[in-house]
Curated annotation (Swiss-Prot):
Gene Ontology CC annotations of this record: spliceosomal complex
UniProt region (Disordered), positions on chain: 396-476
Record bears the keyword Nucleus: yes
Function recorded in the entry: Involved in pre-mRNA splicing.
Gene coding for it: slu7
Single annotated GO MF: pre-mRNA 3'-splice site binding
Taxonomic source organism: Aspergillus fumigatus (strain ATCC MYA-4609 / CBS 101355 / FGSC A1100 / Af293)
UniProt name for this protein: Pre-mRNA-splicing factor slu7
Segments of skewed composition (Basic and acidic residues): 414-444, 456-465
Cysteines engaged in disulfide bonds, as pairs: none
Length: 476
């Protein structure tokens, strides 16, 4: 008896669905049992295609024959604007020429799931990594050919060596490249320390005082021997003597071994390494001198490469301590007179002094002739006498030139009258000066203030117009 195949509803029994819904009605044919009428209540499991990605550069069908409105002005495609166009910018775009109109790109709607959105390798083409593999194989081939056993390396690449020879060759290659798997992780990560510890510089028990807790030398270790000269300060060893030369030799050995030219070991055979290094230095220097000579012969200019004789007199570095002040000058140095930007001590027009050497009545002038006119001709002592006479005439002490020309020279009897007139004018001048001085307030009076007598006299002498209430007097 053959069993009836179970339908979809009987596979998953749900106790929360009533029986009148779960059971098949009598009017339902058996042929339709394959169709689950409760499919809308089932959990829909849609398998998303995680490998779905954009088809880059795919075009949709043939290109248009003429420009369409709204298309790219550069290439004529409808799927992007002109500022988003990735084609070469044309001098005249497809909008104006109507030629070489590109086909439209395929705009795809890629809907990815939760996992596909976070897949970092989604859309990656594995064929792109083939270029990296080929480059690596080419480098490996070049490395093996540059080694001393180039023929063995060629046999390994061709697969002609047996397993034992291949293992020996691989071990040698791994030892030279320092990348072998037979080395442990600790061995590969260990840094080779070839510097000497400070507590081993001097093995005298009384000199080196090393504190293991703080890992430092007390009193910088030995102070009187050669070992202490190498110690400059904490955790620093001064490079002195042949230290720099040793470092260059060590670097040359390492670089030569990396290039695969020679297998130089500085500690095992230092003599050969030194000879090869000096030989290479001599060859390099000879090439440089030959190139320099060829350039000088071709272009010239050897006279400009000679040392200048004034180079020895230039300021060189010294240990003399110099202290500067706030203005930037050397502190304690004698101050030089500040020079003006204008020309100084330039004597013109027979003057013996410069303009501005004499001051009178708020005017600058020449001290040699008392002239206040700039760039005037010097008159010397005559000019001074003329200036004094003009001053006396302005003060009224001497008669004017018109009066002296009109009157005749005074007689002997009139000389006394002239002297009396001069005495009278002197007395009047002194009297005027005395009155002026009495009107001026002295410094003591200004400091002491206004006295009561002065205030009373001021109030009496003040005009009535200054009083604002004076206008109301007599109006009532």
């Amino acid at each position: 008896m053959s069993r009836k195949p179970a339908d979809v509803a009987s596979k998953e029994r749900n106790e929360y669905i009533p029986s009148f819904i779960a059971k098949k009605p009598f009017y339902i044919d058996d042929e339709s049992t394959a169709n689950d009428y409760l499919e809308h209540q089932r959990l829909q499991k849609q398998a998303t295609d995680q490998s779905k990605w954009y088809d880059r550069g795919k075009r949709a069908g043939p290109a248009a024959t003429k420009y369409r409105k709204g298309a790219c002005e550069n290439c004529g495609a409808m799927t992007h604007k002109s500022k988003e166009c990735l084609s070469r910018p044309r001098k005249l775009g497809a909008k104006w020429t109507g030629k070489d109109i590109q086909a439209d790109e395929v705009v795809q709607n890629v809907e990815l799931g939760w996992d596909a959105k976070r897949d970092r390798w989604n859309g990656y083409d594995p064929s792109e990594y083939r270029q990296v593999i080929e480059e690596y194989e080419e480098l490996e081939k070049l490395k093996r050919n540059t080694k001393p056993g180039a023929q063995d390396g060629k046999k390994i690449m061709d697969g002609e060596l047996d397993d034992e020879e291949a293992a020996i060759e691989e071990a040698r290659y791994a030892e030279e490249s320092d990348m072998g798997r037979q080395q442990s992780t600790a061995t590969r990560n260990l840094r080779i320390r070839e510097d000497t510890a400070k507590y081993l510089l001097n093995l005298d028990l009384d000199s080196a005082k090393y504190d293991p807790k703080t890992r430092r030398m007390v009193d910088m270790g030995a102070q009187d021997d050669q070992a202490a000269a190498l110690v400059a300060e904490e955790n620093f060893v001064r490079a002195s003597g042949d230290a720099a030369e040793f470092e260059r030799a060590q670097r040359y050995a390492w670089e030569s071994q990396e290039r695969g030219d020679k297998k130089i070991h500085l500690q095992a055979n230092p003599t050969s390494g030194e000879i090869l290094r000096k030989k290479e230095q001599a060859e390099t220097e000879a090439k440089r001198q030959a190139q320099r000579k060829a350039l000088l012969e071709k272009y010239g200019g050897e006279e400009y490469l000679k040392p200048t004789p004034l180079r020895e007199t230039m300021v060189i570095e010294n240990e003399r301590f110099v202290e500067y002040d706030e203005s930037g000058a050397i502190k304690g140095a004698p101050k030089n007179a500040v020079k003006s930007k204008y020309p100084e001590d330039v004597l013109v027009n027979n003057h013996t002094t410069v303009f501005g050497s004499w001051w009178h009545n708020f005017q600058w002038g020449y001290a040699c002739c008392f002239s206040t006119v700039k760039n005037s001709y010097c008159t010397g002592e005559d000019g001074k006498k003329a200036f004094e006479e003009a001053e006396m005439r302005s003060m009224g002490l001497l008669p004017g030139p018109e009066t002296s020309d009109q009157t005749s020279p005074p007689a002997k009897g009139e000389t006394n009258d002239i002297h009396e007139a001069e005495d009278l004018s002197d007395r009047s001048q002194r009297k005027a000066d005395t009155e002026t001085n009495t009107r001026k307030r002295t410094m003591m009076e200004m400091k002491s203030g206004v006295s009561e007598e002065e205030l009373e006299s001021y109030k009496r002498s003040r005009l009535a117009a200054d009083d604002p209430m004076a206008s109301f007097i007599g109006k009532e």
